[in-house]
Amino acid sequence: MAASSEVSIDPDQWFYIYSLERVAYVCERVGSPVMEEAELRRRRRKRPFLTTTHDELELQMEDLVDELYGVDEQGSSSAAARKRRLTAEQVRALERSFEEEKRKLEPERKSELARRLGIAPRQVAVWFQNRRARWKTKQLELDFDRLRAAHDELLAGRTALAADNESLRSQVILLTEKLQANGKSPSPSPAPAEQTAVPAAPESAKSFQLEEGRRLYDAAGSTTTTNGGGGGVAMPAARVAAARAASNDSPESYFAGARSPPSSSEDDCGGAGSDDDYPSSSVLLPVDATLVGDAFEHAVAATVAADEEAPLNSWEWFWN
């Protein structure tokens, strides 16, 4: 009974079993390319977003599509129920449809594309979603390149402006040193608004006075004036008028139409004599005509000096 239960194993079978165990052990310790590829695919399915290369990204997308469509509409999971990959013609048709309208895929459009291409509507939706994500990424790259080019252009312009500024600054320093070497200190020129004009009133008043005196002197003839002794002296009427104006130095003479207060001959002459003994002030003139001329010239010189000290009021006061 015990002998019948024993299983006899051929030596060749023992070698075959040993070889299988040895191969399994070696594969487990070292790893074969087939086992490594299978393990890599298994890990990628568990962690589909840890890789970064383009090929691995495409492989991840394919694995995701396979996982999405691994279950058919009846809910049975099998390898035969997985959807087929898109052909080149189907991809071109989907690309043309995407170029026409990049917005969200409408249900009617999705159903029409799926019916025309012979694929499931869900597969069309997934393809459009992935294609739209790639398009947005491409647009971001284009925008980044455009902004980077604009930044580089602005930076180049700033560098050029800085170089021009430095060149102008060096020229200013060089010119300043040359001016200092020549003994001319650079001073800013005053603004036109700050420059004060010298008033021309004194010159005009002086010219007017001289011209008026010359005109009166040339136009007037020689008149005869008499003194208290009865002697006649020929002298210009202009000088006589100037002498009278100089002798009339009362405050009332400065105001037009003013009347002088009454005065008696006693106050003027100290109570001695009468008007007959002393001639009136209108004929009290020097005998010598040269003295009258000197008095006139002295009055004109005093007026000019007063005009220089008070340029705005002296000539008006004199001629009033």
Curated annotation (Swiss-Prot):
One of its GO terms (biological process) is positive regulation of DNA-templated transcription. Residues 265-278 have a biased composition (Acidic residues). GO terms for molecular function: DNA-binding transcription factor activity, RNA polymerase II-specific; sequence-specific DNA binding. It is found in: Nucleus. Gene3D superfamilies: Homeodomain-like. One of its GO terms (cellular component) is nucleus. Residues 79-139 bind DNA. Pfam families: HALZ (PF02183), Homeodomain (PF00046). Residues 181-209, 249-282 are annotated as: Disordered. Keywords: DNA-binding, Homeobox, Nucleus, Transcription, Transcription regulation. Expressed in roots, leaf sheaths and blades and panicles. Coiled coil: none annotated. Residues 138-182 are annotated as: Leucine-zipper. Probable transcription factor. PANTHER family: HOMEOBOX-LEUCINE ZIPPER PROTEIN, HOMEOBOX-LEUCINE ZIPPER PROTEIN HOX25. Belongs to the HD-ZIP homeobox family. Class I subfamily. This is Homeobox-leucine zipper protein HOX25. It comes from Oryza sativa subsp. japonica. The lineage of its organism: Eukaryota, Viridiplantae, Streptophyta, Embryophyta, Tracheophyta. The gene is HOX25.
